[in-house]
Amino acid sequence: MSDMEDDFMCDDEEDYDLEYSEDSNSEPNVDLENQYYNSKALKEDDPKAALSSFQKVLELEGEKGEWGFKALKQMIKINFKLTNFPEMMNRYKQLLTYIRSAVTRNYSEKSINSILDYISTSKQMDLLQEFYETTLEALKDAKNDRLWFKTNTKLGKLYLEREEYGKLQKILRQLHQSCQTDDGEDDLKKGTQLLEIYALEIQMYTAQKNNKKLKALYEQSLHIKSAIPHPLIMGVIRECGGKMHLREGEFEKAHTDFFEAFKNYDESGSPRRTTCLKYLVLANMLMKSGINPFDSQEAKPYKNDPEILAMTNLVSAYQNNDITEFEKILKTNHSNIMDDPFIREHIEELLRNIRTQVLIKLIKPYTRIHIPFISKELNIDVADVESLLVQCILDNTIHGRIDQVNQLLELDHQKRGGARYTALDKWTNQLNSLNQAVVSKLA
């Protein structure tokens, strides 16, 4: 464990000079310092003894100061590791009383940010909510806008995870108000903060599948030019944009967005890059592209990643119209692929696409073909075959009719040929018109 992690990423050697008073060489300060470091030495081997020892730092300090603040940070961490959450909250509330005058504004801000980041690893949502709300209450008097914004953003993310959208919208309204001019317009000087708010709001609309509001906000976020956004924030925005486009059937736009999201996540070191790469593969298959998504320089290193391998194999089976292999991969890697709700949402469409391609190839030599035979070849029920045939006939992929009594598909090759000749005739007429126009101009 590094010193940085050891002290909530705010260790004693950070850019903070202890502000001793003129009598900083007096005995009480030396005693405090010794007591603090002796306590810290106990932390790993005997955390309970360390807690008692840190308590002595608080008793020795008299007036609130930096050593008491540091001791409380350590006590919060130890209690967190011991899962003694009520005591941890008590110590955190005690630490928040120090931020008004006992330590500098920058130091308190860095420390609280680090504590909140550390505690956010907890899966106990109620505990996190109490932490964030307690921090916001303490900040009412402290007037620290940056810390208020960051804490509210964390609370908003918590509400998003808990699907408490009413509470999240209230947070979003407050965040928006903090980034507005006197005229009520977005303050473009606060572009980076605005993008953070948009990212949070876009995630909410994506979860709610509210594409109308999502689209407007997504376009708005891409037009903010006054910010140097964190790649993680842009990754979130582009991922949500990709989901929006995919749900609207705009597969090429979705592919572009997922690729941009993947690159941003990759740059920020976010594990979300793997998930986004899966979405990129999904969009690639839905747009019926013959290009392998792993041919790109950015995606190639992940081709054999265990998390991605199933999707890589799925692409291969899909491009080869190998329905048996496609279904086998889905079955073998069910949790890897189907546990993601967004992928699961679109797998049926992929199956329909590959079944349609196999179906077209299967029926090509025939004028009449038994539906049970198609059912056996596609490995789906007769009812599902009929449903697929109806869809293909309606969109003119197949020219024919279904004889349900005799369970036959009767194909009209003449009609299909007629349609081809009609298209050729139209094309010939267009060429003649173009030729006449060129001759007229040259005359």
From Swiss-Prot:
**What broad class describes the main subcellular location of this protein?**
cytoplasm
PTM section of the record: Phosphorylated by CK2 and PKD kinases.
InterPro entries in the cross-refs: 26S_Proteasome/COP9_Components (IPR050871), PCI_dom (IPR000717), TPR-like_helical_dom_sf (IPR011990), WH_DNA-bd_sf (IPR036390)
What GO molecular function annotation could you give as one example from this UniProt entry? transcription corepressor activity
Q: Where is this chain's protein located in or outside the cell?
A: Cytoplasm; Nucleus
Q: Which GO terms describe its cellular component?
A: COP9 signalosome; cytoplasm; cytosol; nucleoplasm; nucleus
Which protein is depicted?
COP9 signalosome complex subunit 2
